């Protein structure tokens, strides 16, 4: 098997490290205090990059020891503690000496502590910008994606980032991120948002929607950074707030926004429950322009009068339908309508999600003014990029059947970081039990669910993404929005009750135009899902088992939450309809749509192709491994 991109990067890092040691034989490698005087390990411990050394403010790469200095990356280039010196001390241990890239004299400036992920760009990969997402977007898969826009005076799309005036610093970060050209949602959404228009965008995770709303927000704040905000109190006044349904998604958006806002002067802070609020309060007191938060924690901060919505210019809701489905509607309405938030039309409001059923659109329309509706075809959620398999498995046989699948992957050499397996279950107890059973049977696994502390969830996700535990057992807490690259196989151990939840689950694989595999265990307890599941598979030109077709013909397909709206788009603009009546097709029409006389319109959806060659190995459309990396998800 050819070496992966990560393997090549590791070998380059090793080579770079040896070269540096040879060129400076008289200077021993820095050893953190907690590792000193310990016996040598059997394998050498890879040194951390300079910017990751906790409490180490030593000289930037290639510089000399100098008093104070004016380094850009690590607190002015002098001292062992970049955050502990006296302001304006001039030199010595910890002094920033009036240096720093903004040339201020004295005082404390948050930007001086900003880690520079690009400092060693010429010699080694940047962890924050390259190793984080080891997938390269397959642009060929985006060429034929259906896109629909509706609304008044829709700005034309762009084809390159060079056509967009985002500001020099942000454009530099985009180039450093190695973003080649905009994804479809970015091509359309960014010009709309730069025009100051409200937007409702229907696009699933993996399509680049985080960058689609982060770029215009950061650019807008950069152009008006000197706005006067009230002073003299402990209340902070962010200019933008981004709401997300889960802690994990909030943390992910925060990390992306921090990456995009590097050296722009835009300060990004995250706030979510499950962690001590005091630490988040201290971060807020240091200044905030963009606040990424979950609805519950933001309400808490508003009630404590530690955050005010008075100066908000941008309001973004990511996974908006999920937040409403999870019961956050009262909290969201309180934030938007009852606090000191500027009214719609004064602020700019952005709603992004993978699905926008008509009921959700009614509620969301209360937050928007003269908005543009953007629908981007499903990329990586229910297309030919994902091979969907449904197998009839009794509850008592599920574990042994899962073991057969995992053994088949292992025998075909499909394992490790490039082929992660995500297993969805319905209950927290079931997640813990299955994780333990897999570990006992020789398959390293971890799990996340609502009863895990935030720290436990973050540790589990990190272990899964790195490939140390290539199997993650999860409840729906991980189904929406999480950025987990390399998921090659999604197993619905327990099928959800909602077909949209199924769509979101399998959307964890086949991301960024790459191939993926989704396996579902179906039995008599899932009969209500039979018909929408069969129709969903038909839409993507998947093979529907005969037994599932029989179940589908027997099951009743009423309204409820298993009625998917919008067909291949996951949602449509209800303003195009005379009413909220049912039985009409999506954008691609032909009289299709669920319950509307004749299956999916537009010639049967996405057209098949690819697949995994009939087994878990030997993929004929990309396969599990061997593909280089990207930061687009």
From Swiss-Prot:
N-acetylserine modifications at: 2
Biased composition (Gly residues): 68-80, 87-101, 580-600
Binding-site list for ATP: 203-210
Record protein name field: DEAD-box ATP-dependent RNA helicase 37
Domain notes: The Q motif is unique to and characteristic of the DEAD box family of RNA helicases and controls ATP binding and hydrolysis.
Motif (Q motif): 159-187
Residue span, Helicase C-terminal domain: 401-552
